[in-house]
Design a protein with these regions (language model features):
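The feature captures the beta-strand-to-loop junction immediately N-terminal to the Walker
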Residues: 27-29
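ABC ATPase NBD coupling module
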Residues: 46, 58-79, 103, 115-119, ...
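ABC ATPase C-loop
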Residues: 137-138
Length: 230
């Protein structure tokens, strides 16, 4: 994919693959192009060149609602829940696709949300809001789930809880593309990893292999393309 914001060239020949039941993490410093990659896949910032192949369908020129209909769920950074609606009403918003995920199952999977089903979105903690965002995406019964910084601003115990939920997606056969700044935790649950630097893929390989390279993990926040290519 080649993606631009106006005249600014953001993504340079970015190509990645996520298989069924696989968790893939996309890492890189702030401004590397991680969120733009998710937005390009989702049709929110379409690539100017290249293709987005979703389940055998060319989707690079599809509007976001059509991408969602193909089976892509998107949990954006910042959660984007409806603050004035109750938890239960927030879960009525998505255009549900037929499948195993129903409101009943969501409440079984997220007991915190079941306990707070009558609370408004603004009354939830950051972790509960993140769970609500993920739950809404699951009601689309996605084949691919795009997650942007799900651990942002969460206490360590809540990070652990959210990541356990993400891990459970593997057993469901859902493909997960995870954008994260929490490098160690995300590498611990991922099958494979990509690293973006200045809009280009500079590392692609097994997550465990990257996690074992302490120097590279430590330098992740300021990694340069030259360093990652070594």
């Amino acid at each position: 994919m080649q993606t631009f914001y106006g005249k600014s060239h953001i993504l340079h020949n970015v190509g990645l693959t996520v298989n069924e039941g696989e968790i893939v993490v996309l890492l890189g410093r702030n401004g590397a192009g991680k969120t733009t990659t998710l937005r390009s896949i989702m049709g929110l910032t379409p690539p100017r060149e290249g293709s987005v192949n979703l389940f055998g369908t060319e989707a690079s020129r599809m509007p976001p609602y059509k991408v969602a209909e193909l089976g892509v769920g998107y949990v954006p950074e910042g959660r984007k829940i409806f603050a004035n609606l109750t938890v239960e009403d927030n879960l009525r918003v998505p255009l549900a696709r037929p499948g195993a995920w129903t409101t009943k199952r969501v409440f079984e999977t997220f007991p915190r949300l079941a306990e707070r089903r009558d609370n408004r979105g603004r009354q939830l903690s950051g972790g509960e809001q993140e769970m609500l965002s993920i739950a809404r995406a699951l009601l689309l019964n996605p084949k691919l789930l795009l997650l942007d910084e799900p651990s942002q601003g969460l206490a360590p115990l809540l990070v652990k809880e959210v990541f356990q939920i993400i891990q459970a997606m593997r057993k469901e056969g859902i493909a997960v593309l995870l954008v994260e700044q929490n490098v160690r935790v995300s590498l611990a649950i991922a099958d494979r990893a990509y690293v973006l630097d200045d809009g280009a893929i500079v590392y692609s390989g097994a997550a465990a292999e990257l996690a074992s390279d302490e120097d590279r993990v430590r330098s992740m926040a300021g990694a340069s393309a030259k360093e990652w290519a070594q």
